[in-house]
Amino acid sequence: MKKNTIYFILFTLSLNFSFSQNLKDKNILVVWGGWEGHKPELFVKHIENWLIFEEANYKIHNGLEAYNSYEELIKYDLIIQSITMSKISKEQENNLLKAIKNGVGIGGAHGGLTDSFRESTNYQFMVGGQWVDHPGGEVNFKVKMLKDELTKGLNDFEIKTEQYYMHYDPNIKVIANTKFNDEYYPWIDGVVMPVAWKKEYGNGKVFYVSIGHDPDEFINEENAWKLLTRGLKWATR
């Protein structure tokens, strides 16, 4: 474990000089829970190591009780969420959306952000999309970077993970995408789908990347980690 932590710190040091936003002294809330198949605790561990390196003020909370108070949420500059499925109460939903609308950023990956609360269309409207399928399960596919400040200097890459098929808001700014083939569903052959996007919701900013079925994907693929961490910095108030 100690060896892995040292490796992670060295890895992070090598990646974070190219994007100017600084998280030092920013207040970050990390919320995790839901379906354990997406290993939210491991995702949060990687995020925590990064936040320590960035010298951010952070709090980690397991469960949706983190959204019980708007007065507490509005104190944060960024919420990083990793909750697949689960159910959010109306009060929690209102608190979260109000905080983001008033300037708190939010970001996350994979099902931890776009498959969180399937019954909450208000939440989906804020995030900008909803997962609906991953044809073939874990498959090999290519992620293509599009021109944007967050992708500057990043390379396209091949990865084996779930290739998310999304229902998404045309108002999002897509910064990375992928193309489906006809292996599992012939009618989606050639469909181009977002892999990462950014958007605004009121005064708040939203960042999402769809890879990360196994959180270690972000450690094993340099460009994926850069994309995630740059996006989270961008979303920070």
PLM features: residue spans?
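Helical hinge/lid and interdomain linker segments adjacent to catalytic or ligand-binding clefts
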Residues: 22, 26-31, 36-114, 218
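Short, flexible, glycine/charge-rich loop motifs used to bind or transfer phosphoryl groups or to couple energy/partner
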Residues: 18-21, 68-71, 163-165, 197
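A glycine-rich, often tryptophan-bearing local segment used as a flexible ligand/cofactor-contacting loop or short
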Residues: 86-153
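Bacterial Sec-dependent N-terminal signal peptides
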Residues: 1-23
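Catalytic beta-strand/loop cores that center a nucleophilic Ser/Cys/Thr
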Residues: 51-54, 75, 134-208
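Active-site donor-binding loop signature of nucleotide-sugar glycosyltransferases
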Residues: 111, 179, 211
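Extracellular ligand-binding/catalytic regions of CAZymes and related secreted enzymes
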Residues: 22-30, 53, 71, 184-193, ...
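Oxidoreductase and adenylate-handling cofactor-binding alpha/beta cores
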Residues: 122-130, 158-159, 165-173, 202, ...
